[in-house]
Amino acid sequence: MPDLAALTRNAVKVLPEGELERKLALGRPLRVKLGIDPTARDIHIGQAIPLQRMRAFQDQGHTGILIVGDYTARVGDPSGRSKERQVMSGEQIDENAARYFEQALRILDRDRSELRFNSEWLGKLDFGEILRLTRTITVSRLLERNDFERRFKTNQPISVSEFLYPLMQAYDSVAIKADVELGGTDQEYNLLTGRDVQIAYGQEPQVALTTPLINGPNGVDKMSASLGNYIGIDDPPAEMYGKAMSSVDALMPDYYRLCLEADAPPPADPYAAKREFARRLVERWHGAEAAAAAEAGFDRMFKEKRATDDAPVLELPDGDPVHVPAFLADHSLAGSRGEARRLISQGGVRLDGEPLAADELDVPRSRMAGAELRVGRRFARVAG
């Protein structure tokens, strides 16, 4: 008998009601779809939540189809956005997609997985087929989306390509003959549009199963790699542990339930809860030995108020002054120069214990040389 509780664990909605049970009763492997646009290089623990549901289906004999949206990324999902997304380059899409495949297989069963690029079918549609696709939905129906409605009422631009996005995602379901589609709660509209388009193409419509979205470590914004507010499943153990420990206390119940799939609630003491979460999270993705080492390193840094013994020594570039955002990005202490500037403006970059001011982007070489550098939770030494 199918274990429905395992399949729907932590699900927010399963639509239509009773449809998943009916499909399971057919006794054949279901085709379970999850689409991810490769807008960043790493899968974070929030994106792992629906991937875990896909693995639960695979463990019961069903087929998981992970669709990397290399074609839809050229449009960008407008869900939850107040303005049009910037279009990504083909080179960036291809690079990110390769990493998504690699990381997703840390969660999924390779033997029960199909890993696909939606350019396989979307790139072949002719204009006649696109017109057929657009006839499956009305503009008034599209404007029912909260994000489109809000932008329309405030005279914010909405491109026709954005209107096409939910239809492109829906056509993915047609192309692979999806029985179930997984997605975050912000994807409910797109998932239900997939049902409508499948019906228009003469297919049995998919079940829509939505999973919760979680906030990133700052506790304010949703977890997002593009915002730099995330914990990546491929983060190094020490970095993963540090990000977990820097998370706001209020996140722990959701993080335990959704990211660890823990049955018991977190400890009542906030610090103990975060330590246990950080250790268990690193253990989940890197193993017990790495978790123990990360915890020990954290204790050396923060309990003893000093950098770890193996803090890297960073060579200064030529020139004076040193442009700090470039220096941090070049040494992988920030994901980009823009992220480095944000860290500086937030007081998150310190030289010998003193935070750099928001306008201190260029620092004299003499001040940098030999200094202890702290960026967020990480330490380094600058060569003298």
Where do the language-model regions lie?
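N- or domain-start disorder-to-order transition segments that initiate the globular core
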Residues: 1-26
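Divalent-metal (Mg2+/Mn2+/Ca2+)-assisted nucleotide/phosphate chemistry catalytic cores
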Residues: 11, 87-210, 217-219
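N-terminal catalytic cores of NTP/NDP-binding nucleotidyl/phosphoryl-transfer enzymes
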Residues: 17-78, 182-188, 194
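Short, hydrophobic/aliphatic alpha-helical segments
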Residues: 27-35, 64, 165-175, 273
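Flexible loop/turn segments at secondary-structure boundaries
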Residues: 40-41, 73-75, 123-125, 215-218, ...
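Buried hydrophobic packing segments
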Residues: 50-57, 167, 190-198, 255, ...
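Well-ordered mid-protein domain cores that form the structural environment of catalytic cofactors
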Residues: 58-108
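Conserved nucleotide- and phosphate/pyrophosphate-binding catalytic cores
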Residues: 197-384
